[in-house]
Amino acid sequence: MEELLAHTINAAHAMQAVDARELSRVIVDTTVQEKAIAYPTDSRLLEVARKKLVLLAKRHGIGLRQSYARQGPALSRKAGRYAHARQFKRMQRVLRRQRTVLGRVLRDIQRKLDQVNTGVRERIAIWLERAQQLYTQRPKDKQKLYALHAPEVECIGKGKARQAYEFGVKVGIAVTACKGLVVGARSFPGNPYDGDTLAEQLEQTRGLLQDVSVEPTVAIVDLGDRGREVDGVQVLHRVSVLALPRCRTC
């Protein structure tokens, strides 16, 4: 990714689409790179985990006492109906039953792991670990699992009225203040505070601009980065639109 960005910047500079002065003034901000996952309700996650374990057992010849192939989807539909009708006590009762079903399938497979060879056991282990996490996690827990196939997904709240929570990974973006050429993009796993990402983002931008012999000297940021200072870079907050550089003067 960084190599592609570096080639893009070098090409833009060689074509004189941007000059050195413009590349030295950047706007830095963070956003969420959303993952293409379904909304992670407890009922759906428990049912997906049960289906995955049953599929793995069938694929590797592990006989289960019961697969709950009929009861599992029925419980998932029932939980959805109760949630829609705002009958939350009934919904919680269904969720407890779904958690019990997942636990039974999980323990059944764990008891029979000795029947399979070491290679199969290692391939199944990662899915058993994730299913165990879904089985034990509760709504108030931290470091929750939001997608069985994508454990890197995090729940991030950015204060948006239309979307209170987004599911993905926090990323930082740096663009030139005049023409909006992307001169930096990187992920920040763990959802760190916005201000704690500024120095790392500018360090990446500085590395990408080495080939054109330019360093960022001005960083325009929002109030999430207030109080942060970076050596050799002037950090500007509360910048008026009129104070931004105009393209014809860059």
Task: List where the protein language model places each region.
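Short, conserved catalytic/metal-binding motifs centered on acidic residues
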Residues: 1, 24-34, 173, 180, ...
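Active-site- or DNA-interface-adjacent structural scaffold in DNA-acting proteins
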Residues: 1-152
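A short secondary-structure junction signal
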Residues: 4, 37-40, 184-187, 197, ...
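Short acidic (Asp/Glu) and glycine-rich catalytic loops that position anionic groups and cofactors
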Residues: 30-32, 78, 82, 104, ...
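Short, glycine-/Ser/Thr-/acidic-enriched flexible segments
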Residues: 33, 153-154, 176-180, 187-190, ...
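Flexible, glycine/threonine-enriched loop-and-boundary segments that flank and lead into catalytic domains
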Residues: 147-166
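Electropositive, glycine- and tryptophan-enriched low-complexity nucleic-acid-binding patches
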Residues: 160-208
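Helix-centered, glycine/charged polyanion-binding patches within enzymatic domains
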Residues: 210-250
